Amino acid sequence: VAFGTLTSISESKFQFGLLYAGSDDGKIHVSKDGGVSWQLISGNLPQNLWVSRVAASTHKKERVYATLNGYRNDIFESYAFVSEDFGVTWNSISLGLTNAVNIIVEDSANENVLYVGTDNGLFISLDKGATWQDFSNGMPKVAVHDLVIQTKAKELIVGTHGRSIYKIDISKVQELTNEVLAKNIHLFKVNDRIKSDRWGSQNYAWGKPSEPSQEIWFYSNADGVVNFTIT
């Protein structure tokens, strides 16, 4: 693919006309006037790569994320960066990622949570990119090319290369604040259940009786056995 093609564009929700654009020659530009003028902001990033994604933060006006990859030069290192000053300076948040990075998404409800799609699956960070964990959770280890958060349903939609589309409930992930993570164990709110007269009854003669169930979600900061009593 010849140089000169835009590969990613993102508009800040905090300011009309605050735009970021990435291209296939590794350059990232910012416009603060709706595209009338543009300023190069990728001078101190690795050069001659492909801007796989540029994403304005949904939590802070000055913050922007960028991911790069070097497919054309057989470079498969991970490149993920964040800027807290409109791209004037950048910090790498790639440590712990594997293979080329295709996309980065900031959680819409919790600014500490980031999702990254790589050529080797899905990753998550709970600390703004300081550390990363595999978040594939049973998904095949294939390239993840797109991620979208469905804010109303609190679901992460994952688009892969040749292995379909997946979704995962991230409602509890969004509740993993610093206060929750500091606890030894945390029990998330249990949804209310309304008793039904159909519980224990059969819908048809050869069917199984209806059996109610309840999911109980909790967070523990260490492996181990936990005993608890439900009253």
Predicted regions and their residues:
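Beta-strand-rich binding/interaction modules
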Residues: 214-218, 223-231
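Beta-propeller blade termini and top-face loops
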Residues: 1-204, 211-212, 221
